[in-house]
Swiss-Prot record:
InterPro entries: 6-PGluconate_DH-like_C_sf (IPR008927), HMD_C (IPR004889), HMD_C_sf (IPR038182), HMD_N (IPR055205), HMDII/III (IPR010063), METHMP_Hmd (IPR024190), NAD(P)-bd_dom_sf (IPR036291). Belongs to the HMD family. Signal peptide: none annotated. This is H(2)-forming methylenetetrahydromethanopterin dehydrogenase-related protein MJ1338. It comes from the Archaea. One of its GO terms (molecular function) is oxidoreductase activity. Keywords: Oxidoreductase. NCBIfam families: hmd_rel (TIGR01724), PRK12557.1 (NF009208). It comes from Methanocaldococcus jannaschii (strain ATCC 43067 / DSM 2661 / JAL-1 / JCM 10045 / NBRC 100440).
C-alpha cells in the first residue's frame, strides 16, 4: 500500500452506518491471516480512522452482537460515538457513509435518514449499492423536499482495516453529465478521505461500481484483453482503429447480453470454450501477451462442475444490439418523458445488484 500523507482539514461531522460483520471478516474470510491488518474491519474501522483524523464521528449499529465487547471498546476509545438509532446519526452528520447490507436494507436506511440529515449533507454509498441506484431510489424526495442533499460514494474498494485499503472511490458527475452531488459536496468527500491518509479517486458515479466493487476483477481482465487486442490490432495487423473498437463493442455487448438473458452458464455454452480456444490462439502474435496465455489456460482447465452446469444450460432468446445506438434511437423516435422513463428503468436494471 502506498504511504499517503494525511492532510489537515476542518473538523467534519461524519455518520457511518453499519459496523461490519466481524464474524465474516475474521472467522470466515480469515482476513488477519490472508491480508493482515487487525479488527475491527469494515464500517467500524472507517469510523475509527475518521475519528483519528480529528473528525466528530457517529457510528450507527443497532446490532451490538455484531462485534465483541473488546472491539467495541476500540471503536469508542478512538473517540467514536456509537448509537443504535439511525435517525440520531442522521441528525449529526454532514457526510453520511452507508456501510450497510446488500439489498433492501440499504434503501430503507437511506430513505429513513434523508428526512433528517442537515442541510447540504451528502449521502455516500460503499460497496453494497451503486450511487446511481441510490439516487434513483431517493429521487422523489431529492427533487422536491431535499434538493440540497447530494449523492456520492465513499467506496473503500477493499476491506477497511486491511493493508490493501489505501484509497476511496468517490462518485462525481455521471458519464452523461448528471450531477448527483455539488462540487462542494464532492470536495468534502475527497477531503475526508485524504484526511484519513487515503488516496481519493473521483470517477463518474456510474463508473464507480465497475472499478470499485468485487466485479473489478472482471473489469481488470476485460480491460487487459481490450488493450492487448488494441496493441496487436494497431501495431501488428495494422487494422483501422474504428474496426478494432467496433469488434470490442460487439464482443463485450454480446457477452453482457448473454449473461443478462441466460446467466453465466448460458453465455459459456453460447461462446463454446473449445472453439474459442482455437480461434483466440491464432491471435497470439507477441511474446508478451501474458493475459491471453492466462485466459487460454483457464479455458482449457474449466472446473468439471461448471462444465456440467454449462451442458445443462439454456441459451435464451437474446436480442443483440449496440446499447448506445439504441438509446439514441429511442430518444429520436419516442422522445420526451416516455423515452427518459424507459432509459431510466433500463439503467436501474443495469446498476442494481
Amino acid at each position: 500500500m502506498r504511504n499517503i500523507r494525511k492532510i489537515k482539514v476542518d473538523n467534519m461531522k461524519v455518520s457511518v452506518y453499519g459496523a461490519g460483520n466481524q464474524n465474516l471478516y475474521i472467522n470466515k474470510l480469515n482476513l488477519p491471516e490472508k491480508f493482515g491488518g487487525e479488527p475491527p474491519y469494515g464500517g467500524s474501522r472507517m469510523a475509527i480512522e475518521f475519528a483519528e483524523a480529528g473528525h466528530d464521528v457517529v457510528l450507527a449499529e443497532p446490532n451490538k452482537n455484531i462485534m465483541s465487547d473488546d472491539l467495541w471498546k476500540k471503536v469508542e476509545d478512538a473517540g467514536v460515538k456509537v448509537v443504535s438509532d439511525d435517525v440520531e446519526a442522521a441528525k449529526h452528520g454532514e457526510i453520511h457513509v452507508l456501510f450497510t447490507p446488500f439489498g433492501k436494507a440499504t434503501f430503507r436506511i437511506a430513505k429513513t435518514i434523508i428526512e433528517h440529515v442537515p442541510e447540504n449533507a451528502v449521502i455516500c454509498n460503499t460497496c453494497t449499492v451503486s450511487p446511481v441506484v441510490l439516487y434513483y431510489s431517493l429521487e422523489p424526495i431529492l427533487r422536491t423536499k431535499r434538493k440540497d442533499v447530494g449523492i456520492s460514494s465513499m467506496h473503500p474498494a477493499a476491506v477497511p482495516g486491511t493493508p490493501q485499503h489505501g484509497h476511496y472511490v468517490i462518485g462525481g458527475k455521471t458519464t452523461d453529465g448528471k450531477e448527483l452531488a455539488t462540487e462542494e459536496q464532492i470536495k468534502k468527500a475527497v477531503e475526508l478521505a485524504k484526511s484519513a491518509g487515503k488516496e481519493a479517486y473521483v470517477v463518474p458515479a456510474d463508473v464507480s461500481s465497475v472499478v470499485a466493487d468485487m466485479g473489478s476483477l472482471v473489469t481488470a481482465v476485460a480491460l487487459s484483453g481490450v488493450l492487448d487486442y488494441y496493441t496487436v490490432g494497431r501495431k501488428i495487423i495494422n487494422a483501422p482503429k474504428k474496426m478494432i473498437e467496433q469488434q470490442v463493442i460487439m464482443t463485450l455487448q454480446t457477452m453482457a447480453s448473454l449473461v443478462e438473458t441466460s446467466g453465466i452458464e448460458g453465455m459459456v455454452k453460447a461462446l463454446n470454450p473449445e472453439l474459442l480456444i482455437r480461434s483466440a490462439s491464432s491471435m497470439k502474435l507477441l511474446d508478451r501477451q501474458k493475459d491471453l496465455d492466462a485466459a487460454l489456460e483457464i479455458l482449457q482447465n474449466l472446473d468439471e462442475t461448471l462444465k456440467a452446469e454449462v451442458e445443462k444450460a439454456e441459451i435464451k432468446p437474446t436480442t443483440l444490439v449496440a446499447a448506445q445506438s439504441l438509446v439514441k434511437e429511442i430518444k429520436t423516435l419516442i422522445g420526451g418523458a416516455a423515452a427518459e422513463g424507459a432509459i431510466k428503468r433500463s439503467a436501474r436494471k443495469l446498476f442494481e445488484h
